[in-house]
Curated annotation (Swiss-Prot):
This is Vacuolar protein sorting/targeting protein PEP1. The chain crosses the membrane at residues 1392-1412. Residues 1531-1577 are annotated as: Disordered. It is a single-pass type I membrane protein. InterPro entries: Sialidase_sf, Sortilin_C, Sortilin_N, VPS10, VPS10-sortilin, WD40/YVTN_repeat-like_dom_sf. BNR repeats lie at residues 58-68, 101-111, 179-187, 414-423, 485-495, 531-541, 762-771, 859-869, 1141-1150, 1183-1192. Keywords: Glycoprotein, Golgi apparatus, Membrane, Protein transport, Receptor, Repeat, Signal, Transmembrane, Transmembrane helix, Transport. Residues 22-1391 are lumenal.
Length: 1577
């Protein structure tokens, strides 16, 4: 009994504290406030401040009572605690310009600081004070000023109440002021950039070089770094602003500025000063703020080195860059600008540098996972601990177009050894195991997933952490299912704390925890409550609040986590009087009867489970979980005890710069990094020994490891000082082949999608440098479709009926289920004006594809594939016609090709309501149809197996396409639509369809696509309908074709095809063979040297032979440049026997650049050209930076590979190329990709004036020195002149200027319908035909009242010529049928006004004649003296000036009439003479003739020749008028009775008038009916 009584007494003594603990209630004080959302704490004090409305309130007792501060007279917009003087200094910004308030005594008193006044009409939008970590008197004030602009409220109201807008944010300026006397005086640090009129925004960003008391940077206390930027926003063509920048250092408060030389020719995008590094981010392209960036690192503010990035950095979050405890740089990368608003600005990837800050790498387990939001949490008080979470973007909640079936997995992992090893967050909670949907003992498939850790604001504890999240495999994440968890071992294992998500805060180093649910109804009680724990989360007690609030924050009043007092800030919507905020002060300081812990209440807790981290073992003394006391060391920081480890291990080392970790974690050499380093610069040997490991900077282990060197091969490694040294190559190896790839055509990044031989999809956003696999939920990808109207969208079809869609270039994918139908492999058809609207074709009743019941069905979706509706049965091809036409008859019109199950014919139907109620049959029987360039063209079968084409430009009116009648065109059995651009359709009409011997005629239409003329005969095509036809991108009217030169014999099956290449510079009106270069690439003459291009010209392999149709001759951004594989000779040779040729003037002149066939690619608008051998293994490429004048070879890999393709972004504007290659390996072959980056070989970016003006780096020049007029104008193009700079994202092809419009010549016209171009250059009517009925135009345009007959010519649509030759001059107008009355009214003249004018003129003439007769003739003797008057006579009466004028008129009249009489007499005699001569000589010969349309050069000058502007022209005119008088000798002139003598049959060359151009003598011998009419002269 005694023993039992003793045990009972002991149990009672132990129980008393627990009873006290249970009975303990914290002290809670409520304050009602208005508009108070952030409470700030001064460090190591009981003082809190907050902004309430526009004033500042303060509490000196941890928030129990509040009062308004004295000394602040202005309305306040913001308050903040000085991060370097957290104990006593705070700053409040005034609503008024240039004023701030500062306190240095925890808010007891405030001093007003006044900054310099702004300029007139310039208003401050707020100022911010930055302080110095070591000197309290050093300030930097940063202010933003904008022009005051009153804006019309009706057009642009400032707010909902219509207040006027007073800031013009497009003209804003940052200003920085410095003070070294505590704010008593300020001086401006003025930007060293001059602001011009185009600068919309000027930015000045300055900061002290010292960023902390422990800063390791070599700098003085007065060192200030400033970044000045000017941004110009005036050009619509640019997707982003032009930026110029300067990064400078000042040590004398801005009096003098020293620019960092390394960044003089670069665009500095931002900078960040850290503890031991300064990081500078430079923008790769000043004209594209989405371009890739470079990272530069320095530890002394003078020497910067470019860091190695494993991917393109395009959207860094510069304000989030920080250093961890090891000195590694943590670089978050934000996502690009998304179409989804909620995705903008989120962290998409995190890169971590080595301890030197020069080599970055991603978190290993996130590198090849699905792309998503990444969060990294590193509690500073837990050395070596990192918690990272990956959350797939495709699973973002409430996304537009969110689809079902998405299974992309997120994951959260933890590392306690600085990221060397990672593990999932294990849930070890047997008591709650049944509450989870998965087996928590299966850690890999059932772990804690969270998303909300942040780097800032974590309270130090001894390994006690809380978070919200869910437990699962990461495939499902619903915010509503979150719960709250707690850990006591630094995050390695977790237990459930609450079944709902909570806000939480810890105090007393983790011994006191407060949690409040986000939603008060979580416990089925509408009133709010908070929970608290005094045993590190083991048990929880509820405290009921009397008001329902929405918690905004809960915080410990001591930022270091040592105190036991908390603030709960929340708001309610129930009060209508404006008192919406409730502030609760919660005090736990008297818990456990105010007992303070003693030594035996503590235990040691070891970080990282006692392992060495950074060469040190860390431990913390913490209170035992069940101890009945509080630590109560208020304002003391948590102590971390460390013990250096004796031996260094591999965990204390990192890979040297030249090495990377392989899949096993071993450091192996990397060729690309070796090229970037300088290890091979120091030796002439083939190999150099390098240690693969280096000790982590700052590691404290005592005894280093012995690291053996590894021999690195230096063969082929470029030496320092060469351009090749700066080329960066990234190699990726695969155990599969890439079968498909395609870039997204945007300037945002270099994203491309790839499909391998296994049907797996991969995405890259950096031109192939890094590649991620697309999660397709285990489905094989069987087809990929890109949206041609929205460049960021693509659709992947899965083998199990899923469709994976992306609208952000593969950053995220959404999954939907296709309709229950068999996939037929038909492409999607898209709406050009609605991104989420498209048509999918599936097979219905298709158990077998050969089943008679199997038929296609068109399914329509308007929500990006989330839902489908059946639109039309038996449809096999549809078009959203209403979205394609410029002027559609109905914008909702859809056209579909329908093939009924029971019929072999196809029909064309249309609808304006997606075939719900409206269905119109357009054609009963068609072969097919297609859309191109605003036209829809339908092929309709005709009798005798012929085809007819019908064209529409509005979807309602169809017109038959009239093909030219030609002697070599038989049946219209096949045609190919080649292109439609600027109002014309190019079409190839087959004239021979024997397989392997195919060819046909090239045709071109008029503006509405209905009337075609022949441009060229016997143009080559293949059996599949592809044609050797290519329009040169970016230039008007230049086309290359291959013709079958022996077409007659090929058609008769006597010979194989012999191809020749032809070029036109005026859109097909005239064709010529390509001029061959004089010498080959080795300087030797070509074997064929005939001056006749028909026998010796350049020939190129064309479209019909390409492996990839995207490999075009030209590039739209590299104007005038073309590559081709061909030969010089009489015709085209086989591909393997050909060379590679290049031109820079649009095809006028060519040069051989390689002796063998090569693949080519353009970069930087032609500023970088790359060639790689085709069909042969290689380890090198050739590149040129001077537009092909010189070429350099570069070894891009160690082993030779067979390059399958070379590619870059579709706009050919990037400096990065991607090679696909295959290399032979042991046991087979491996597929490889090589990303080759040329950015660094250029010294700088070219200086470009965004208004298009010439500069030092750009000049306007014609395409070639021989270029004159093309399409009626002379054009100059803006071109780069300095090969040492790169162009970047400038749409250079859009900067051209027309010098002048030229006079019209023969080259500005083409033959009209039913006319053909004869060998003499004239357009002649096809034999046996009449001109097209010109009156047909009246039927097409009912409003017309007149029409004109065709002249046989029509002006080329692209021509802008003015004046000159008018070959298309219309005839006299004719009245349209039925419009005779309107026609007569248009051209008739009213009799009344006409009679009045006519009579008035007659009266004036009569009066003038009478006056002259009276004063000049009658007074001087009348007509009797008329014959006696002579010029200069003085016998006439002249009494005044009027008499003199009248007499002069009389004398002049007499002179004129006398000469006219003589001339008439002379003419009469000559006519009689000629008639007599003709009668006697008629039949002997015809007279000489003059032909007008023989030679272009003659015609170009004909207008001037016949205009009488110069002496030679007048001679020619006289020559034509007196055609029978030339070359007649004097003694041959007969009398009337004499017989005519003969004259020579041909004129000699000396008799040709001087005005004729040389070589055109044959054109002057027949002045017949073909001479141009006066209106053409």
């Amino acid at each position: 009994m005694i023993l039992l009584h003793f045990v009972y007494s002991l149990w009672a003594l132990l129980l008393i504290p627990l009873i006290n603990a249970e009975e303990f209630t914290p002290k809670v004080t409520k304050t009602i406030a208005q508009d108070s959302f952030e409470i700030l704490s001064f460090d190591d004090s009981n003082t809190l401040i907050r902004k309430q409305d526009a004033s500042v309130t303060i509490s000196f007792d941890d928030g129990e009572t509040w009062e308004k501060v004295e000394g602040i007279e202005d309305e306040i917009t913001w308050i903040y605690i000085d991060p370097f003087n957290r104990h006593d200094r705070a700053v409040a910004t005034s609503m008024y310009e240039s004023r701030l308030y500062i306190t240095n005594d925890q808010g007891k008193s405030w001093e007003r600081i006044t900054l310099p006044d702004s300029e007139k009409n310039i208003s401050s939008r707020g100022c911010y004070i930055e302080t110095h970590p070591l000197n309290k008197n050093y300030f930097l004030a940063k202010c933003n000023y904008c022009e005051k602009t009153e804006v019309d409220n009706e057009e642009n109201s400032g707010d909902e109440e219509g207040a006027p807008v007073i800031f013009n944010i497009t003209h804003c300026t940052d200003k920085v002021f410095a003070s070294n006397d505590g704010g008593k005086s300020f001086s401006e640090i003025k930007s060293s950039l001059e602001r011009n009129e185009n600068s919309a925004i000027s930015i000045s960003d300055c900061g002290f070089a010292k960023t902390g008391k422990d800063s390791d940077l070599e700098s003085s206390d007065t060192s200030i770094i400033c970044l000045f930027q000017n941004m110009q926003l005036i050009m619509d063509e640019f997707s982003s602003p032009y930026t110029e920048s300067k990064l400078v250092l000042t040590t004398d408060w801005g009096k003098s500025l020293k620019e960092f030389d390394q960044f003089k020719d670069k665009v500095v995008n931002g900078y960040r000063i850290l503890k031991s590094h300064m990081v500078v981010i430079t923008q790769g392209d000043r004209y594209n703020d989405m371009s890739s960036m470079d990272v530069w690192v320095s530890n002394d503010l003078s020497n910067f080195k470019m860091a190695y990035m494993p991917t393109q950095l395009r959207h860094s979050m510069q304000g989030e860059i920080y250093e961890d405890a090891m000195g590694r740089i943590i670089l978050p990368m934000s996502r690009e600008r998304s179409d989804q608003e909620e995705d903008k600005g989120i962290v998409s990837e995190i890169l971590i540098s080595d301890s030197q800050g020069l080599k970055f790498s991603p978190i290993p387990w996130t590198a090849n996972e699905v792309f998503g939001y990444i969060n990294l949490y590193q509690p500073t008080y837990l050395k070596g601990t990192m918690i990272a979470s990956l959350y797939p973007l495709s699973r973002r909640r409430n996304r537009k177009g969110k689809a079902k079936g998405v299974k992309n997995k997120g994951v959260t992992k933890i590392s306690v050894d600085n990221g060397l090893t990672w593990t999932v967050l294990k849930v070890v909670d047997p008591d709650n195991a049944d509450s989870f949907d998965c087996d928590i003992t299966d850690f890999e498939n059932c772990s804690l997933q969270n998303m909300f850790y942040t780097r800032e604001g974590s309270t130090p504890t001894a390994g006690i952490l809380m978070t919200t999240g869910i437990v699962g495999d990461g495939s499902v994440f619903d915010w509503g299912d979150q719960r709250t968890f707690i850990s006591r071992d630094g995050g390695l294992t977790w237990k459930l704390a609450f079944d709902f998500p909570c806000l939480y805060a810890v105090g007393d180093y983790g011994n006191v925890i407060v949690a409040i649910p986000y939603n008060a109804d979580e416990d089925d009680d509408p009133q709010s409550e908070f929970y608290y724990s005094l045993d590190q989360g083991k048990t929880w007690t509820e405290y009921q609040l009397e008001t329902t609030i929405y918690p905004n924050e809960v915080m410990n009043t001591t930022p270091d986590g040592s105190g036991a007092k908390f603030i709960l800030n929340g708001f309610t919507l129930a009060h209508m009087d404006g008192t919406t905020n409730f502030i609760y002060a919660i005090d736990f300081s008297t818990a456990f009867n105010d007992k303070t812990c003693e030594e035996n209440d503590f235990e040691d807790w070891n970080l990282a489970e006692g392992k060495c981290v950074n060469g040190v073992k860390y431990k913390i003394r913490r209170r035992k979980q069940d101890a009945q006391c509080l630590v109560k060391k208020v304002f003391e920081d948590l102590q971390l005890f460390e013990t250096a480890c004796d031996k260094c291990t591999e965990a204390d080392y990192e890979c040297a710069f030249e090495f990377v970790r392989d899949a096993t974690g071993k450091c192996v050499p990397d060729y690309n990094l070796i090229v970037l380093s300088d290890v091979c610069d120091k030796t002439k040997k083939k190999t150099v020994p390098v240690k693969p490991l280096q000790l982590v900077k700052g590691d404290k282990c005592k005894k280093p490891m012995t690291v053996k060197s590894v021999d690195i091969s230096c063969e082929g490694v470029p030496k320092k000082g060469t351009n090749d040294k700066e080329i960066v190559v990234t190699e990726n190896k695969f155990d599969f082949k890439i079968q498909f790839y395609q870039y997204f055509d945007t300037v945002t990044d270099e994203s491309l999608l790839m499909i391998n031989s296994r049907g797996e999809a991969y995405i890259s956003h950096d031109g192939g440098q890094t590649i991620r696999r697309v999660d397709s939920n285990g489905e094989t990808i069987i087809e990929v479709v890109f949206n041609p109207y929205y460049n960021s969208s693509a659709y992947l079809f899965g083998s199990k009926g899923s469709i994976f869609s992306t609208h952000d270039r593969g950053y995220s994918f959404m999954t939907a289920k296709l309709p229950e139908a068999r996939q037929l492999g038909m492409p999607l058809d898209f709406n050009a004006k609605a991104q989420d609207t498209f048509i999918y074709y599936g097979g219905k009743n298709c158990e077998s594809i050969l089943s008679p019941e199997c038929h296609a069905v068109a399914y329509l979706t308007n929500d990006g594939g989330e839902t489908f509706t059946e639109m039309l049965d038996n449809a096999i091809h549809c078009e959203f016609a209403g979205s394609l036409f410029k002027y559609p008859s109905n914008e909702d019109m859809v056209m579909c090709q329908v093939k009924e199950k029971s019929s072999q014919t196809r029909s064309l139907v249309s609808s304006t309501d997606f075939f719900q109620d409206d269905k119109n049959t357009v054609f009963e029987n068609i072969i097919g149809y297609l859309s191109t360039g605003g036209y829809i063209i339908v092929a309709v079968p005709h009798e005798n197996n012929e085809l007819r084409a019908y064209v529409t430009i509005d979807g309602t009116e169809f017109a038959e396409a009239k093909f030219p009648y030609d002697e070599d065109v038989g049946k219209q059995e096949a045609f190919t639509i080649l292109e439609s651009e600027k109002g014309s359709i190019f079409l190839h009409l087959a004239t021979n369809l024997v397989p392997g011997r195919d060819f046909g005629n090239l045709l071109k239409s008029n503006s509405n696509g209905t009337s075609f003329v022949t441009l060229e005969h016997a143009v080559n095509r293949n059996t599949f309908g592809y044609v050797d036809f290519e329009k040169i991108q970016g230039l008007e009217g230049i086309i290359l074709t291959n013709i079958v030169s022996n077409s007659d014999k090929v058609a008769e099956n006597k010979e194989d095809k012999q191809l020749k290449t032809k070029i036109t510079f005026n859109e097909g009106s005239d064709w010529n063979f390509l001029k061959p270069p004089k010498r080959d690439s080795e300087g030797k003459k070509f074997s064929c040297s005939s001056k006749s291009l028909d026998e010796c010209s350049l020939h190129l392999h064309g479209y019909t032979e390409r492996k990839d149709i995207r490999d075009t001759y030209s590039s739209g951004s590299a104007l005038g440049m073309m590559f081709g594989v061909g030969n010089v000779g009489p015709n085209l040779l086989p591909y393997k026997e050909c060379s590679t040729f290049f031109t820079t003037d649009g095809g006028e002149t060519w040069a051989e650049v390689k002796k063998t066939p090569h693949q080519w690619e353009y970069g930087d608008h032609g500023g970088i050209l790359v060639l790689v051998p085709e069909n042969s293994e290689t380890d090198s490429i050739s590149y040129s930076t001077d537009f092909g004048k010189t070429w350099k070879d570069y070894k891009f890999c160690a082993d030779k590979v067979l390059v399958k393709d070379i590619t870059t972004v579709p706009r050919d504007s990037a400096l990065r190329f991607l090679l696909f290659g295959e290399a032979a390996d042991i046991g087979g072959s491996s597929f490889r990709t090589y990303t080759i980056d040329f950015r660094n070989i250029f010294e700088r970016q070219c200086d470009f004036d965004i208004t298009g003006k010439e500069s030092a780096d750009y000049k306007y020049s014609p395409l070639s020195s021989k270029s004159n007029c093309l399409f009626g104008h002379q054009t100059e193009f803006l071109r780069k002149t300095d090969e040492n700079c790169f162009i970047g994202n400038i749409p250079l092809s859009e900067f051209s200027r027309n010098i002048k419009n030229c006079s019209c010549t023969r080259q500005d016209f083409e033959c009209d319908y039913n006319f053909y171009k004869a060998n003499d250059g004239t357009c002649k009517l096809v034999k046996g035909l009449s001109p097209a009925n010109a009156a047909d135009v009246c039927k097409k345009e009912p409003d017309l009242i007149e029409y004109f007959e065709s002249s046989g010519y029509r002006k080329i649509p692209l021509s802008t010529c003015e004046g000159g030759l008018k070959l298309d001059a219309p005839s006299s107008p004719h009245a349209c049928p039925g419009k005779e009355k309107e026609f007569k009214e248009k051209y008739s003249v009213s009799a009344g006004p006409f009679a009045f004018i006519f009579i008035s003129i007659l009266l004036i003439i009569f009066f003038a004649a009478w006056f002259v007769y009276d004063r000049g003739i009658r007074r001087n003797g009348g007509f009797a003296r008329f014959g006696e008057i002579r010029l200069g006579d003085d016998g006439l009466i002249e009494n005044n000036n009027t008499d003199r004028v009248v007499n002069n008129i009389v004398k002049s009249g007499f002179y004129v009439f006398s000469n006219i009489g003589s001339l008439l007499q002379h003419t009469k005699t000559n006519i009689a003479h000629v008639i007599s001569k003709i009668r006697e000589r008629f039949g002997n010969r015809t007279g000489p003739s003059y032909s007008s349309l023989i030679h272009d050069q003659f015609l170009d000058e004909a207008d001037d020749l016949l205009a009488g502007h110069d002496e030679d022209a007048n001679d020619l005119s006289s020559f034509m008028d007196q055609g029978s008088n030339f070359e007649i000798e004097e003694d041959d002139v007969p009398t009337l009775e004499e017989e005519h003598t003969s004259y020579t049959d041909q004129p000699t060359t000396t008799d040709v008038p001087d005005a004729l151009p040389e070589g055109n003598e044959e054109n002057i011998d027949r002045p017949d009916s073909t001479a141009p009419s006066n209106e053409n002269q």
